[in-house]
């Protein structure tokens, strides 16, 4: 439900992952990506504990099935990585605007706080 609401508000697809799989999906590619195992590049990216925005060059973006990763915000619970909020897109999609990136980071922070409780 959270991914659905966030996707509607942001106007783009939203994925939520744990450390191994996509656990929630909304928007384009939802059925293809739900329950998919995380690619090793995404696992390494989340372990950096930083907000990620894809490079402008589509050839350098991380692939998620038939989609591309445009933004990733790690979910940090008590200092440990528990997953992330991901914004997928196509190779032709523009990079997300600053307010969309901030919303993904806020969503990850909210989920982290909720998991800490």
Residue ranges and their predicted role:
Residues 1-64:
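Structured interaction and signal-relay segments at domain junctions
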Residues 1-9, 37-44, 48-52, 84, ...:
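Juxtadomain coupling helices with adjacent low-complexity linkers
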Residues 63, 67, 96-99:
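Short amphipathic alpha-helical interaction segments
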Residues 64-76:
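A short beta-strand signature within small-molecule sensing/ligand-binding domains used
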Residues 75-85:
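Short hydrophobic/glycine-rich mini-motifs in sensory/regulatory modules
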């Amino acid at each position: 439900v959270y991914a659905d609401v966030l996707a509607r508000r942001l106007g783009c697809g939203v994925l939520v992952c744990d450390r191994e799989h996509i656990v929630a999906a909304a928007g384009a590619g939802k059925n293809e990506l739900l329950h998919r195992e995380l690619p090793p590049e995404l696992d390494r990216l989340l372990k950096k504990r930083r907000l990620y925005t894809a490079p402008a060059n589509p050839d350098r973006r991380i692939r998620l099935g038939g989609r591309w990763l445009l933004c990733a915000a790690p979910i940090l619970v008590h200092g440990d990585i528990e997953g992330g909020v991901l914004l997928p897109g196509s190779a032709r999609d523009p990079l997300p605007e600053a307010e969309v990136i901030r919303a993904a980071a806020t969503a990850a922070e909210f989920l982290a706080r909720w998991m800490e409780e």
